[in-house]
């Protein structure tokens, strides 16, 4: 199992640059950025990195606000500018962002994502795309010379997981447990594509109290239909129930369970102070040994 890390809600681009350099010095396999509403652009951030792990990725880049031609152009530009190593993770996000904040109709995320990938993938591969569909009409070829990035897709529900297996190199998941990976995700995507799991952690000597606080902090996340359905499959009531809370041993044990469940890549996302993040990432040597 490959291990990488991400930085949750960085305050400044410099924080991302420093975190990626730290990940590289630690020998981690990957570093990931995320598109959060009103925050930094993940692809631009990756293009600014100096020292970095072998793989950098977006987990995820939102599809609805970006035309697939734009996404392909930006991704290939990052590949060319940085010497490769990009993994492009995309996904439809959620209605509260796409429709409520941006005013874009959140119509059939499954059909939209299928069509998006149908246009995006061949563009990344340097092909001329001629497509006329429900959401996009495209007749173009990109004059951008760069190796195609690996293509991942955010997926939790059964049909989205099956779509990821059909059209991408892997899935990106978050707010999941090892049991959800073993019983729901892995059986639907098989063993031929990657299963990338963002594992959110928190070092705490009072895990029950910490989980109660996180349940309040992440309450709105649990109301999003995709996450609510996924949590329901596992019999969980809150995204906080998926956070690994405890000491170093608890985190190492959780990583072992994710590996045994079929996870190919873990993206560690530590909560807490900078010192907590350092302690968490220091565990990688323990786990690897």
Feature names for model-found ranges:
Residues 1-289:
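Active-site-adjacent structural elements that line small-molecule/cofactor binding pockets in enzymes
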């Amino acid at each position: 199992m490959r291990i990488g890390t991400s930085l949750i809600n960085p305050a400044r681009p410099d924080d991302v640059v420093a975190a990626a350099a730290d990940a590289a010095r630690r020998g981690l396999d990957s570093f990931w950025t995320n598109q959060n509403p009103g925050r930094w652009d993940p692809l631009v951030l990756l293009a600014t990195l100096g020292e970095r792990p072998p793989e950098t990725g977006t987990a995820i880049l939102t599809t609805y606000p970006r035309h697939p031609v734009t996404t392909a152009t930006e991704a290939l530009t990052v590949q060319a500018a940085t010497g490769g190593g990009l993994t492009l993770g995309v996904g439809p996000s959620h209605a509260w962002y796409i429709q409520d904040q941006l005013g874009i109709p959140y119509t059939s995320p499954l059909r939209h994502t299928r069509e998006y990938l149908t246009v995006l993938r061949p563009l990344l591969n340097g092909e001329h795309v001629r497509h006329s569909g429900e959401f996009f009409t495209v007749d173009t070829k990109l004059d951008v010379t760069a190796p195609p990035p690996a293509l991942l897709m955010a997926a939790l529900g059964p049909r989205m997981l099956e779509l990821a297996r059909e059209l991408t190199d892997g899935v990106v998941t978050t707010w999941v447990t090892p049991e959800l990976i073993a019983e729901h995700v892995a059986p639907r995507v098989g063993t031929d594509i990657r299963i990338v799991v963002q594992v959110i952690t928190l070092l705490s000597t009072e895990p029950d109290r910490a989980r109660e606080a996180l349940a309040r902090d992440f309450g709105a996340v649990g109301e999003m239909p995709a996450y609510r359905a996924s949590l329901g499959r596992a019999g969980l009531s809150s995204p906080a129930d998926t956070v690994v809370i405890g000491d170093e041993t608890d985190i190492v044990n959780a990583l072992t369970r994710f590996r045994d469940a079929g996870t190919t890549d873990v993206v560690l996302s530590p909560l807490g102070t900078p010192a907590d993040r350092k302690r968490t990432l220091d565990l990688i040597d323990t786990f690897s040994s």
